[in-house]
Amino acid sequence: MALSRRDFLKSSAAAAAASAVGLSVPKEVEAASKEAQKGWRWDKAVCRFCGTGCGIMIATKDDRIVAVKGDPLAPVNRGLNCIKGYFTAKIMYGADRLKTPLLRMNDKGEFDKKGKFRPVSWKRAFDEMEKQFRKAYNELGPTGVAFFGSGQYTVMEGYAAAKLMKAGFRSNNIDPNARHCMASAVAGFIQTFGIDEPAGCYDDIELTDTIVLWGSNMAEMHPILWARCTDRKLSDPNKVKVVVLSTYTHRSCDLADDVIIFKPNTDLAIWNYIARSIVYDHPDAIDWNFVKEYCVFATGYPDIGYGMRNPKRAEELGYSKKEMQTVWHQDHKKLSEDEKRALAPFGYGNADVMKMKHVKAAGKHWAISFEEFKKSLEPYTLDYVAKVAKGDPDESLESFKAKLQRLKDLYVEKGRKVVSFWTMGMNQHTRGTWDNELSYVVHFLLGKQALPGSGAFSLTGQPSACGTAREVGTFAHRLPADMVVFNPKHRAIAEKIWKLPKGTINPKVGSHIVKIMRDLEDGKIKFAWVHVCNPWQDTANANHWIKAARDMDNFIVVSDGYPGISAKVADLILPSAMIYEKWGAYGNAERRTQHWRQQVTPVGDAMPDIWQYTEFAKRFKLKDVWKEWKLPDGTVLPNVLDEAKKMGYSEDDTLFDVLFANDYYRSFKWPDPIGEGFLNTEAEGDKRNVIGADGKPWKGYGFFIQKALWEEYRKFGEGRGHDYAPFDVYHKVRGLRWPVVNGKDTPWRFNVNYDPYAKREKELGHVKGEFAFYGHALKVIPQGSLTGPDKNKPKIHLPNKAKIFARPYMEPPEVPDNEYDTWLCTGRVLEHWHSGTMTMRVPELYRAVPEALCYMHPEDAKKRGVKRGDLVVIESRRGKCKARVETRGRNRPPRGLVFVPWFDERVYINLVTLDATCPISKQTDYKKCAVKIYKA
């Protein structure tokens, strides 16, 4: 059979696609495919994008990626990919890929903050970077410098960055963009369970009878999981029910049996309605054995503010009068009648204004009785909640009530398995921690948690927000394996593993990502290094942060693959190797860790982030950083140099020598059998002979630094419920769900039938039944009532118990009014990732969705004299941007709300959004603020 070149290529592509999903193809076509694939090397990897963690197969030829397909052996996606996954390799080959360091300079070749970007060598870049770092560090100490981290760090990158910052520079000012996406989930886990991350796994989808989405457009944000949900629904459509709760209609609603459109923030009231119905109307549905054996009731303060700036400081900085209208709610807020009713059991029923007295005690909580808990639920009758929560003005109240009742009935039905999924809708919320806690309330009361097919399940947004940001501990307060910097026992463990003198690690929590921005504006931080994120596009109320970057005496470094907004406002840009140009590992939403090998050489002079951190570490000696420091709050970090000398260190040793090139690290030899035939730029250099940070051709460290980082990191989790397998094992399997004990992973945590740690608690006689909530954090708490802790009662210990929280409904700090009459919600779309820095460079994805649109109800458009395709201004008290109107399509808001994605830097929606956060988690609420919209 003769084939033309065109037919040959088409046949090859068809054969490759067919084989990827296990279809048989004609022999002629198969032969053509094999001919086309001559010289290709296939290897397993993981997708670059969302927290689903899909496995992919990558084909390389002549040092370039030539094909990507779903990995049929990957248990997460079983050979499927979404549109981003299929084009994941193309993100590396955009026309404007950064290939050399760029420094703002004047015509004399000197650094000039007002100068233009000019190409420089790695040495020149690091010379200036070192100079500016030392300037800030020597002036302000460890609190004067910061790293913007990421939920897209590889595990080893995040570990190296955190170790450099916390063990080396003695600063806790490292915080990831995962603060924006998962912090409320984290706080909910820690406060409820005493340990982070979900109990369940993706297998729950195939095992459940009921899928409920709370603020999650899984069809676009976790499309492969949604494919599994769809398959489950279609497998038994009469039994399996799907309910979607959202503030607007989207693609996930197409599969739903019920769609509940609620008013922003009122998910708090809906959760409480379900809990009230259980306690007051269906007490027989309560699993009292579960509740009494494994739970305790608790509550905390409601008057905790909204995570905004101190209003007086905002006034000093010249915030506008309109902006201050909202900011003052951080100090006090007039309560609506609906809020008064919800807050009455907490002692605020007669208060017209809530004074935010407990801003600094937002996370404090105490045990209460069941009767007190029951009292907190009293306001949430069906009539009250329906009136408060109905989000679509065109839906009848009776229709909305009926949906709430059907939702409640699904949860309450005995024997029915229920999984509650959520993502940013619940997490990006000024009461996001409360919202997460309330999800567990319902599941705990019913005994439907930590069981196959039943549980409250927080879905991660980013590919390694779990595996790196959370597990590694790249947050301002964390160390690996759920340890925290303010716990002296945890610091001692870290200092032992890292071989540090006692007292090296700073005990003070650093600045979270929003506070880093505020500290730059305040002059408290003067050096910031951005890793694997785009915070100047991503952070709400961006006008302030642009000013802090460009108009103040701050030095901003951005390591990136492309020139996004953060790079454009920076002083120095460092070109980073992208995902398959380096070794790495990600951890997904079901605790599954997956590793990959370096597939190709980085482009241009781009270098891996690990190399950037370790090369920078070479420029600082112990005597520069381990001396005594007096911090702004009066804390004194001791001089640990004498102790370091006793440990065999010299004060002239570099941080690289001590942290990344000690005898332990050098024991991991390269070459290594696991990497046979593969590149390792950090270990051995590569064919480019890049002129490195020391001005010499880069030839590698000579040891397997990525493996060393992994093996040291996993020491933190061993025996502490965060056990990982050895490095080599992950290159032989399709990921493992931790804890990994005796070579076996754990599908369901806290369940003695599946979790070795829970099983051990039962064997030791610490629990009687099937569950053990063995997390240790926040397990000694006071006692009290709904109105506060009781100092006369002793604290109680809660081994192996979880908490059922009483949390009231409250409104957000900014709601629509006569001038700013519309809710604004932001989010993502299927085709683009986060700020679009990568996906907007992929021609196929760009053509599919070339710009961000303002999704609006047709009646709202008509009211404003605009139509589909018209350009409008979206304006808030903080800023404005322009976008084109869309009144049809995938997102269909109710009247009074618009949805604008944030992937398009030309539609800079974070100039408009409000930088209010959950006071407990410090996560920004991007889902609600008030705007006005008019024709441009």
UniProtKB/Swiss-Prot annotation:
GO terms for molecular function: 4 iron, 4 sulfur cluster binding; electron transfer activity; iron ion binding; molybdenum ion binding; molybdopterin cofactor binding; nitrate reductase (cytochrome) activity. InterPro entries: Asp_de-COase-like_dom_sf (IPR009010), CT_Nitrate-R-NapA-like (IPR041957), MoPterin_dinucl-bd_dom (IPR006657), Mopterin_OxRdtase (IPR006656), Mopterin_OxRdtase_4Fe-4S_dom (IPR006963), MopterinOxRdtase_cofactor_BS (IPR027467), Periplasm_NO3_reductase_lsu (IPR010051), Prok_molybdopt-oxidoreductase (IPR050123). Mo-bis(molybdopterin guanine dinucleotide) binds at residues 84, 152, 177, 181, 214-221, 246-250, 424, 428, 534, 559-560, 582, 609, 826-835, 910, 927. One of its GO terms (biological process) is Mo-molybdopterin cofactor biosynthetic process. It comes from the Bacteria. Pfam families: Molybdop_Fe4S4, Molybdopterin, Molydop_binding, TAT_signal. The keyword Iron-sulfur applies. PROSITE patterns: 4FE4S_MOW_BIS_MGD, MOLYBDOPTERIN_PROK_1, TAT. One of its GO terms (cellular component) is periplasmic space. Residues 1-31 form the signal peptide. Its cofactor is [4Fe-4S] cluster; Mo-bis(molybdopterin guanine dinucleotide). Substrate binds at residue 902. The keyword Oxidoreductase applies. Catalytic subunit of the periplasmic nitrate reductase complex NapAB. Receives electrons from NapB and catalyzes the reduction of nitrate to nitrite. Belongs to the prokaryotic molybdopterin-containing oxidoreductase family. NasA/NapA/NarB subfamily. Component of the periplasmic nitrate reductase NapAB complex composed of NapA and NapB. This is Periplasmic nitrate reductase.
